Amino acid sequence: MTLPQAQLDFFTTATSMLEWHYNLERNKPGLLELTGVSQHGRATMSGLNDYDYQSLSFLKSDRTHNLQQMRTVTKSAIPNEILEHFKHIKCHCTMGLFPEIGRAWLTIDSEIYIWTFNQTRDVAYYDGLSHLIVSVGLVKPKPGVFVQDVKYLLVLTTPIEVIVLGVTFGESSYNEMQLMNRPVFVIGTDNVSISVIKGTDDGRIFLGGRDGCLYEIYYQAESSWFGKRCKKINLSQGLVSYMVPSFLKVFSEVDPIEHIEIDNSRKLLYVLTEKGVIEAWDISTSYTTARRLGRITQNDITNQAVSLITTVDPSIFKSVKAICPLSADDADKLHLVAVTQCGVRLFFSTTSLNVKQQFGPAVPCSPGENTGFGQPAVQPPLSPNAEAPKGLYLLHVRLPPGYTPNATTNKPKQVHAAHYTEGTMLMITTQQHEQDLLWSLSSAPSVNFTYLVESTALESLDGVVWGLAEVHEPSTPQRKSPLNSARHARKVALLTNQGTHIIEVLKMVDVLRQILLSCNGPHHEEVKMFFQSQNQREACVTALLLATSDTYRGSDVALWAAQAFMLYGGEPCYQHQKFLNASNRNMANQTLGPNTTNVRERQSMFMSTPMPNSVANSPVGFPGSQFNQPISPIGNMQPPQVAVSNENSPIVFSAKHDGLYMYVSRMLHSVWQMRCVNEQFCSNLSQSECALLLSDLRSLRSFLEVHSVHDISSTTRVSFDNHLDRTNSYNTIMMGNTLLPIPEQRVLSEQAQVEETRSLSALNLFVKHACEVISLWNILNSHSFQLICVQLSPEHQKLLTCSTFRDLLITRSEVCAFLIISLINLYLKDAAGVSEVSKNLRENCPNLYRHEDDVTYKATELLMNAKNCTSATEKEHMLRTTLHMCKEAAPTLPLHSICMQFISADFFEGVIELSAVCASKSDPEEVGVHFYNNGEPADDREGYTCFATRMAYYKEVQLMLDHIYQRVCNKTHVQDKSINPLKGTAKASDAKNGATQTIPKIVAHTLKVKDPLIHITLYEWLLAHDMLKELLDVVEPSLGEFLRRSVSQNVDNVVLIDLLWKYYEKNSHHSQAAHILDNLAMTRSENINLEQRIEYLVRAVMCMRNGNVGSSLSNGIFLKELEDKLDIARVQKSVLAAMTELASDKLEAATAVKELNYALYDITQLYQHFAEPFDLWECQLSILNCSHHNDPLLIESVWGQIINSVVDKPGTTSERCNRLFTKIEILVREYGESGVCFPFAFLIRELEVKACQLRFPEGIVPEKLVSMNLDIELLLEYYSRMISMNERVWANEGNEWHLIQSVIRVVSLLADNAQSIWYRSKRRIVGKAQDIVAGCLNICYQKPDTNRLQHSLKELQSQLQRLLI
């Protein structure tokens, strides 16, 4: 899934801002910084200055409106049926709370009663004990030990035994509580009374004994060879407790344990004894590794506190009455708060404080100074990130209200209970008999300070508090989110002797709601005061919490909160000035540009313990200098200096902008760096947590839809002059003191407005995207998440396991894509309908699961049904329906996937039509076609892009054809193996024949599409698979254009050129075909041999002689040229034949053979380069004849060489004779009518000479020449001339009468065949023969021994004479 570049840019902007606010939230000062411990590197104190405690009145200007810090939710009395049992009480009664299940309990002697404290119903009781109940506890069981119905274990102790009961509930959560009749465990106490019971979240049970020892009940599912199923272990004394008799323990000093508190986040346990001793334990994961970290006595605590504060009565530090663990969410470095009877809070840590390593370049303490107090003497250096607990160290002492110089409240007295929750300390004091007072000390309203400031509130209670615990809401998500913590008030249950009293510890969102309701809207000075007195970014976040709350949706409160957000959220501007004392100002509500730090709006005040003011001495315990402000700035204040702005001043975004980003950052804080899945591919975000996060995201999305980005960024815009006078503090700081002219300030303000609008647009887009991603995760959670992940490829699984939700929301959009694919495939694999899940995805993730995705999977479902359909008509209907759906969603479909499914269903037409539609919709203006038709110009980038896009779509057609071809090949291969196992492969021709049954149909369907580019795709495939016949069967003009372009681009490709002339010839373009054939014949290439060149010329001549070719002059000249080339080519063929005979013996001849095949040569080249150098006499004769060369001597010389070359070859006389006249007969047939190249007279004489020399049979020459159908009259004439010449050559050759013998044979042949002579020429020819015979007789008369010749001649004369009668 590729996001558009503009969207990616927006995401980059939003990500940068979110990361900045995320880090700001992570690095905000915690308790260690607020108490000054990190700045000093030593223990500190506070509570002596007036500003350490404030009431909520500082948030408002109107004193008539009283703001509540806590609110009573419900009050409920103890059920009457339980009170009835008080009449029968004998000796002991105690009460307490089970906040985990929303119930209170009461014991009366040996009976226990349990009821729901918010509605006083569902009363349960247990009376199965015979001894007095000393202590009660409720613990979660260990996983896998009991049946699932047992949700909790009720632990009851008596003086002699510990009883563990199983607790079950009805169908709905924590309703209809039932106690199991029989205990699951019963353990003896060894005569040690158990005063307190506490359990951990993982099911471990701890007991505090009156003997001062800490015990753990270890239990398991079954007994083993080495231990019981359940046993009690004394952690204080270890294994020795098993061997020491209990009566010996009475001689040791006893300090009974009064309280046990557990920090489940750190696996720490704290113990408070009756004498005020505090112990810290590292309980680890098993009793075998549990260890005591440290122990601090009441006297040690007092001494150390007095060393910090010497101006108060030391007695206030004595008698610790309550301990409250600080979880990892509450504080990072501080772990425990202890509260004394006078309300003094003592902050402890289990890690030592090392100045040099932990807090950077602060000045180290002298040896005499305290750096923390505790039992271990050695305090090794600790790492700054995750220090291992090593002891118990007092780091901060905070006095309660009433000790400041101008205190208006009384000091708390007789504190006997305390509870800490999210920055609020609740203390129960006894002011008068039978009535307690509730104190609330909260730091929530004072987030604007760099030191600990708390607001105080008091509320009278109806009776004496027996129990104090936080109410656990069943709907509360397990994973804490800063946003949900700020939105939902914590409820605390107080159990008094009158019943249960549930209060809410109100958050700042509740305070703003009170202000809006009391002011009846946002247009009031008190609302403005709220924004100005708070960190403005935080105030905007608070307003957003109200405006987006589901509780107040559609109400006036939500509307007023949105209006307040718009009115008092400020505007963006440029940071025009460089303040000399900028670090003493507060602009923490604004986000500055790069490399800038934030300053404070409110002036910080002196702290109880002086802190260094120099930047060099500021701590570096956490990143981000925006929170490391000097503690005592008043003495350092100097008059501000005016500075002229420069062009590179960073933008200061408005509080609205930063509030929105902070809101989203806190919303996603708990999942931002969390891995999406664990190693078992289970989602780390549960379905309930996912639903809650999704609800928050959708609420914000709705807010941004109602209040557009432009509205948010420009709501408070007024005329520029008025803008300068606004009471908005930071705008006044940034704009009011500048020396810039008004017009330039206006321009800068508008530029800042534009930048903020862009940033908010990015956030708006991110929120919408986040809604879709979390919606998708919610949908995935509602299915079998592990099964979905199993469907992924190993690469995708690895990517998913490495991804955090930050990656999922920002950079890993492909993860969402393949998860969707896996989900849909899961449905398709199970043959389940995808309509419902597709609809769900489309409604909730319209951009992640687009319309085309929906169509794709519906099409997949239809195609799967079509494959299984037996009815051809119904199958065709399904396929056509699928094609219609896909055409509507084109071109953004996963075309390849759908086409592959079409192919698997043998729906080839669908591939063609869908590809064509995708190409058409992607290029509606046919720019790509125009690019092709214009010859593909190199400078037309847009045209090339469209052309490439179309061709990419048509690639699917080629893949389809490949599939068909391969399928036929495989089928042929299988058939060949079944016939003959020795044949391993199928022949390509067989595959081609099989493919021809299907391919023509596809070709015809493809050619119906009017786009020439799909035709090109088809032609290329046919050409690549050597299906030339099918290609030439195409009659579309686009084929000719394709072939022409291909030839022009591949001038040496003979196959393409060959196809082009065939295309022209087939389509009656004979002239073009002839020209191409001519070019083919003349092409210099090793791929064309001479035989093919001659064939091309022959076809070219035939094309030009076709009747469709016009009789123009140019055509005639071209035809004559072709004929001449053909003649020369035939001569070259003879040269090649002769050269081939020599190639086996001569290397030069072999090279000449290649050259003769490589190209056509002219007649001169053939003679000079081949015929003459290699003595190819017949070829020379052919060349002379073809060129009409008129050089008788040269021609006679060639003939003589031919005759000599034949007779010079070895062999008998008969063989030579036959060989010679066979050659002469061949040459006569070729050149007999050629005139100059056939020197008849010379040929007769040469033959007669050779016959005489070689003693050929008498008269063989005339006999052979006559048999060659040569003109006998001309033959008589040439013999007559030779007789008349009477040369000596015959005598020299050894037969003086050889020529006369030949003449006798010539005349004899004439006389024997006289009937074949034309009667009009008969007398003339016979007369010439008589003259020759007479001449021969005359010669014979002159020579002796010629009687035989004379007799023969005379007989001839008589025979000739008879012919004339």
From Swiss-Prot:
Phenotypic effect of disruption: Embryonic lethal. RNAi-mediated knockdown results in failed nuclear import of phosphorylated Mad in response to activation of the dpp signaling cascade. RNAi-mediated knockdown results in altered karyosome morphology, in the reduction of Nup62 association with the nuclear envelope and its accumulation in the cytoplasm. RNAi-mediated knockdown of Nup62 in combination with Nup154 rescues the phenotype of the Nup62 knockdown restablishing correct kariosome morphology and chromatin detachment from the nuclear envelope.
Keywords, alphabetical: Chromosome, Cytoplasm, Membrane, mRNA transport, Nuclear pore complex, Nucleus, Protein transport, Translocation, Transport
Gene Ontology molecular function: chromatin binding; structural constituent of nuclear pore
Protein name in the entry: Nuclear pore complex protein Nup154
Subunit structure of this chain's protein: Interacts (via N-terminus) with Nup93-1. Interacts with Nup35. Interacts with cup.
Organismal lineage: Eukaryota, Metazoa, Ecdysozoa, Arthropoda, Hexapoda
Membrane topology per record: Peripheral membrane protein
Cellular component GO terms held in the UniProt record: chromosome; cytoplasm; nuclear envelope; nuclear membrane; nuclear periphery; nuclear pore; nuclear pore inner ring; nucleus
UniProt region (Required for binding to chromatin), positions on chain: 508-986
Organism, scientific name: Drosophila melanogaster
Purpose: Component of the nuclear pore complex. Has a role in the organization of the inner nuclear membrane proteins at the nuclear envelope. In germ cells, plays a role in the nuclear localization of components of the dpp signaling pathways, such as Medea and phosphorylated Mad. Binds to chromatin, and together with Nup62 and Nup93-1, contributes to karyosome morphology and chromatin organization including attachment to the nuclear envelope in oocytes and nurse cells.
UniProt KW RNA-binding keyword: no
GO BP, one annotated term: male meiotic nuclear division
InterPro entries attached to this UniProt entry: Nucleoporin_Nup133/Nup155_C (IPR007187), Nucleoporin_Nup133/Nup155_N (IPR014908), Nucleoporin_Nup155 (IPR004870), Nucleoporin_Nup155_C_1 (IPR042533), Nucleoporin_Nup155_C_2 (IPR042537), Nucleoporin_Nup155_C_3 (IPR042538)
A UniProt-annotated Pfam family: Nucleoporin_N
Region (Required for binding to Nup93-1 and anchoring to the nuclear pore complex): 1-508
Record-stated family: Belongs to the non-repetitive/WGA-negative nucleoporin family.
Subcellular location: Nucleus, Nuclear pore complex; Chromosome; Nucleus; Nucleus membrane
